[in-house]
Amino acid sequence: DFIQPMLSFMTALFTSDFKIYLLLIGSIFGYFLSRNIWTVVSLGKKNPYWYGLLFILVFSFIYAFWDINVMRFTLATHIFFFGWIKLLLYKNKWGYLFMIFALLVHFSFAIAIAVCLLYQILGKNFVKAYFIFFVISFFASDLNLATIKSQISFLPQNFIEKSDDYLDDDYKKKRVALTESKNFRGKFYQSSLKWAVGILLTTIYVHRKKIKGNLPLENLLAFCLLFVGVFNILSVIPSMNRFQFVSYLFAFTLFFAYFNGEINFKEKRIIYFCTPLILFYFVMKIRIGFEFTGLLTLLGGPFVALIKDGDIAMI
């Protein structure tokens, strides 16, 4: 909300070529995406099992490079993850700066930051309460949008004005109608990931004694239960389901770190059970990506894209 207009203005001082602007945005996005992937990889074994590779791939494609079409939110997501994961796991105070940076990119991350601050106040010692809340959140199917509007009346006026579109009943009906018009794959590929995340998080919670004493993973588990739970409930608000997928970035970070260690037979069976659900989402995500990428995207590279026009999507 602040960074994007500033970058547009700064780019316009030097060139009127929109490709230079996109190159700048893509470079920022690519930096944070690559750093986040490396952060996740550093938590696991050097030679991960096949399901570890699957978790990394899904993490990488939840907000993939073609999602830069939704520039502000996608960019803010990876900046926010970069800042908070450093703070959560390593107590790196620079994380606060990047979280504020994410807020300047997209105002709605004020909600995510509020949940993070709540977790810092409560800490990991309430993990049982987080888990109960997490389970309940899977069955919270409806919220009164008028009630939510009244609860945010204390916010600054510019925040309230921006949130009005998200809390509009007509907008919600349009989103529901759009979902109903999709085929089976379009309707359920996101739900399949939601339930896979729910099952795997529950599995880790049940076996959490294995990570007792591992403070980073204990914190990550407790935070995931709280963060996923909050946005399961808020996902009933139009466009807020985007934050469910922000929460899944943290969940898949935990999955990679936890399941790349020694796991028992029951845990392996649960992974095998969840794999089709995860693959369904992953394949559909790739399918959607084909609508935004062409051969020039895959073969040309950024420098060719600067001088070549007319790339055609593969689908």
Regions found by a protein language model. Name each.
Residues D1-S16:
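Short hydrophobic/aromatic helix or loop-helix immediately within or flanking a transmembrane segment
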Residues T77-W94:
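Membrane-interface transmembrane helices that cradle and orient dolichyl/undecaprenyl
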Residues L24-L43:
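Transmembrane-helix motifs of polytopic, lipid-linked glycan transferases
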Residues F65-F80, V105, T202-E262:
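Membrane-water interface signatures at transmembrane helix termini and the short loops
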Residues I113-N241, R287-I315:
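Alpha-helical transmembrane segments and terminal signal-anchor/GPI-anchor hydrophobic tails
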Residues Y63, W94-L118, V228:
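Membrane-interface alpha helices of multi-pass inner-membrane proteins
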Residues I37-F59:
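Transmembrane-helix signature of polytopic, membrane-embedded enzymes
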Residues F131-F134, I263-V283:
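Signature aromatic-anchored transmembrane alpha helix within multi-pass, membrane-resident enzymes
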